[in-house]
Design a protein with these regions (language model features):
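ASCE RecA-like P-loop NTPase motor cores
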Residues: 1-304
Length: 306
């Protein structure tokens, strides 16, 4: 399996995988090689199981879930706040540089993969960075957040909100599950902490934070998750099934849209995903992709003949 990994751009069929074997073998490989790895399961539940496996086998701080950003389906148009936060956290992780040997893992599924995301440059422009010791007027920070769609409230309780009490500035980024508390001394950031919403108690201290808005609300170039990830290794249970699901969702949404020409601003297609994976390593449990048949096979587990 390591030899297959060392050959860039290969399509590798993993045969005779049973149970949680993929998680175990993949985790062992990732721990040795590092890098960015995107796992595409057949549905949300399978992706969640895979996520939990990697939480147990690797550093869970480097493992991210990438769900859809809508409740039930994009077809119904009802945004899911938790899904948006998880997607944004994964994108933020993909933007960070890694040292040699470090890794990050993204677990997703067809409906989530189908949704386009903002491009890295747009995300960088819309992100507000604050670190301890910065000279920053509170009014300037308020203006930056208001321009990014944040709402001022008395107490923050969900992403996209901020509050101000004297020199204490609370803000809830879309890339975090807990809000930040910035303590100002005059126009200097004196400390930054995460805190619990229910108790208001500090969870941990931070030296620097990125405050990310709801990226779905911004216009601009939108690309596939695979394009955003850049150089990565892709793991599919059944690549043809995933790409067919993506195209099926695209056709369903297209039938509901008043402006069909806008479909490409919301969803990718089979063709786009194949283009964005070109030249990247692909591991698969089923050799189902006619556009990219396996050029190597690895047998990891064997069963006794009946």
């Amino acid at each position: 399996m390591r030899r297959a990994y060392d050959s860039a751009g290969r399509t590798v069929l993993l045969r005779d995988m049973v149970g949680g074997a993929l998680s175990v073998y993949a985790a062992a490989l990732i721990a040795r090689t590092g890098g960015t790895h995107v796992f595409v399961a057949e549905d949300r539940d399978a992706a969640a199981y895979l996520l939990n496996d990697f939480y147990a086998l690797l550093d869970e701080k480097q493992v991210y879930f990438f769900p859809g950003s809508y409740k039930r389906s994009i077809v119904y148009g009802t945004e899911d706040a938790q899904g948006v936060v998880q997607r944004t956290a994964a994108l933020s992780a993909l933007r960070r540089e890694m040292a040699a040997g470090e890794y990050r893992i993204i677990c997703t599924y067809p409906e989530a993969l189908a949704e386009r995301v903002t491009d890295p440059d747009s995300m960088r422009r819309e992100t507000v960075r604050v670190k301890v010791g910065d000279r920053l007027a509170i009014g300037e920070l308020e203006e930056l957040l208001a321009d990014s769609g944040f709402t001022k409230v008395d107490f923050v309780y969900e992403p996209g909100q901020y509050s101000l009490r004297g020199g204490i500035f609370d803000v809830f980024s879309f890339s975090e599950s807990k809000p930040y508390r910035l303590d100002f001394f005059g126009e200097e950031v004196d400390s930054i902490r995460r805190f619990e919403i229910s108790s208001q108690l500090s969870a941990d201290r931070l030296n620097e934070v990125e405050i990310v808005p709801n990226l779905n609300s911004f216009a601009g170039d939108r690309i596939s998750l695979l394009a955003f990830a850049g150089e990565a290794t892709y793991w599919f249970f059944d690549p043809d099934y995933v790409l067919r699901r993506v195209n099926d969702l695209r056709r369903k949404v297209l039938g509901e849209m008043e402006e069909p020409a806008e479909i490409d601003t919301h969803l990718v297609s089979r063709k786009v995903l194949l283009q964005d994976m070109a030249g990247m390593r692909l591991f698969e449990l089923r050799d189902s992709l006619k556009e990219r048949p396996a050029d190597a096979t690895v047998c990891l587990l064997y069963t006794s003949p009946s």
